[in-house]
Amino acid sequence: MAVAVEITRSEVLRPSETLAAGGGGKRSQLTVFDRAAMDWYIPAVFAWDGAAAPSNDEVKGGLAAVLARYPHLAGRFDVDERGRRCFNLNNAGVRVLEATVAADLADALAHDVAAHVNELYPKADMENADEPVFQVQLTRYACGGLVIGTACNHQVSDGQSMSFFYVAWAAAVRSAGATLPTPFVDRAAIAVPRGPPAPAFDHRNIEFKGEHSWTHSYGSLPLERIRNLAVHFPDEFVAGLKSHVGARCSTFQCLLAHAWKKITAARDLSPEEYTQVRVAVNCRGRASPAVPMDYFGNMVLWAFPRMRVRDLLSSSYAAVVGVIRNAVARVDEQYIQSFVDFGEVAAGDELTPTAAPPGTVFCPDLEVDSWLGFRFHDLDFGRGPPCAFLPPDVPVEGLLIFVPSCAAKGGVEMFMALDDVHVEAFRQICYSMD
């Protein structure tokens, strides 16, 4: 049964004037980290049952209050006098849609999520020069349940920034605007080049699509061949994985090692072929000096653990975790400073991020992102945390996202996309530690 989503209201919500701490039409340059992020809107969709759902007015009131501390979200993209893209911190506001569904949320979550999740967040008009960079949709169900779907341009912020923002938004609703954060928003201060700048790595082809970029080698598939899957790993399974590793490791490291092994086996690749994972690395604590964890913007680079297929499949979990850990460790303060220096050298150049377009096939490789640090239970608007995180379609084969489970018993959800021909083989082995 298809669920009809009816848009009932559309407005532009501006920050609370009495609380605004920044903006006022100032311009802010994109950092080289922003330029490396995809110029695309990233959706996030959360659901609250009727007992925990706040009213629309409460949600909008808290949003107006918290936007006063996040001027980039309330601003617009602009072009400076040198023709470079920049932020205009003009407090122009965010788009807010309100919608209704003539069905109960529990029924929709049980039967129709995949069929209508992409109707639960706003669709940005990429051709509109004045398009809000952050957009919200509040969808109310017949039972009183609420789904909040957002879409934010990735060049504005990374996942860590948005997780801090969502928690701050919830706190603003709970406190009726009395509890507001003071995030670090000075982009110029987090990417200071040396004098003279001295990039030491080939960033034009690693983080951007230069002439010799690794992204040029990937093929594509019709979107109907790319299957989206959700795999739940209970806490007990994660604990068993860590025990299987036999050495100290993080939840992310052991789950990535497991997923890399099982997906590679399901793909039935040649033993002599190489496979690598593009791992998003938060650089805030790795930079020198360190950048505050509440910095709002992009501060992500990528690590590339790589193994021959036969070695990956025959190696112990501890060995694979070691390969992942060593690759991530190479994204150190020297590498980060080199990237910042490259940004200065290439400030006037046209740079294209290595983001994969829909239909891209990463096989034999993977790309992984982690929201495991996102405290979903802190996303409490006053009556309780969300009952579900709803994954939108992932249109890129080989992309994995780890998210903490909203289930009462905890655990981790892995949202992923695979070529349909490999799905059944993966399902048969995804919980095996052999």
UniProtKB/Swiss-Prot annotation:
It is an enzyme of class 2 (transferase). Pfam families: Transferase (PF02458). Its EC number is 2.3.1.-. GO terms for molecular function: acyltransferase activity, transferring groups other than amino-acyl groups; hydroxycinnamoyltransferase activity. It comes from the Eukaryota. The active site is at residues 154, 380. Signal peptide: none annotated. Keywords: Acyltransferase, Transferase. The keyword Acyltransferase applies. InterPro entries: CAT-like_dom_sf (IPR023213), Plant_Fungal_Acyltransferase (IPR050317). Belongs to the plant acyltransferase family. Hydroxycinnamoyl transferase that catalyzes the transfer of an acyl from p-coumaryol-CoA to tryptamine, to produce coumaroyl tryptamine. Serotonin and tyramine serve as acyl acceptors in vitro. Can use caffeoyl-CoA, and to a lesser extent feruloyl-CoA, as acyl donors. This is Tryptamine hydroxycinnamoyltransferase 2. The lineage of its organism: Eukaryota, Viridiplantae, Streptophyta, Embryophyta, Tracheophyta.
